[in-house]
Amino acid sequence: MKIAIVGSGYVGLVSGACFSDMGIEVTCVDVNEEKIKSLRQHKVPIYEPGLQAMVERNCKASRLNFTTSLKEALDSGVEAVFSAVGTPPDEDGSADLSYVLGVAREIGQNINNYVCVVTKSTVPVGTATLVREAVQEELDKRGVNVEFDVASNPEFFKEGAAIADFMSPDRVVVGVDTPRARKLMERIYRPFTLSSDRMIFTDIRSAEMIKYAANAMLAT
């Protein structure tokens, strides 16, 4: 199985390393050329216990790759694209979705086969609808009909314990709205949930809300 993760910051890099450590072929995409150059040399720009060794191990095994080109990742035959780009606050405090929707548009401009577009970034409820519209708009511009799904898969790992949290999650929340997307996400997470049924499937809006609710509880 092949997947791509767009955004090689904290969430994207930890997710990519952990997925690859379980045998999935992962391509991490980032527009920052210097960051990608460093990662290709196994220089990890963040500190997280166990991450450096995990990146080195999976790069050497050719399961973890880095590129600045999302098109290159899509052309390699990935089945899912996880969006882990930033959502910085606007002046009014609302989430800036320009990076999230930029990824969606680029996917629509380049896909030729089915993919599931999975949002890992913390986003407002309803973002998946905007992502779907952005992908479809680009497909319409190209005059092509390519099937795709959208999904929400928020992360809950803690800094300093991210590897352990990801590899042995107490829950994996996934918001989907088609059986095909659900089956794909089950395949992706099967190695992480063999010991017990930790996957929680909801509709997409509920998954988006769960992340916001969890953040609000942690902030109190």
Predicted feature descriptions by range:
Residues 1-43:
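NAD(P)+-binding Rossmann beta1-loop-alpha1 motif at the extreme N-terminus of oxidoreductases
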Residues 25, 31-80, 86-95, 135-141:
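Conserved N-terminal Rossmann-fold NAD(P) cofactor-binding segment
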Residues 29, 67-69, 151-153, 202-204:
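Conserved beta-strand termini and adjacent loop/short-helix elements that scaffold enzyme active sites
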Residues 77-78, 114, 169:
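Local beta-strand N-terminus motif with an aromatic residue
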Residues 83-85, 121, 176-177:
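Glycine-rich, N-terminal phosphate-binding loop of Rossmann-like dinucleotide-binding domains
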Residues 88-156:
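Rossmann-like NAD(P)(H) cofactor-binding subdomain of soluble oxidoreductases
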Residues 133-151, 162-220:
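Internal alpha-helical scaffold of NAD(P)-dependent oxidoreductase catalytic cores
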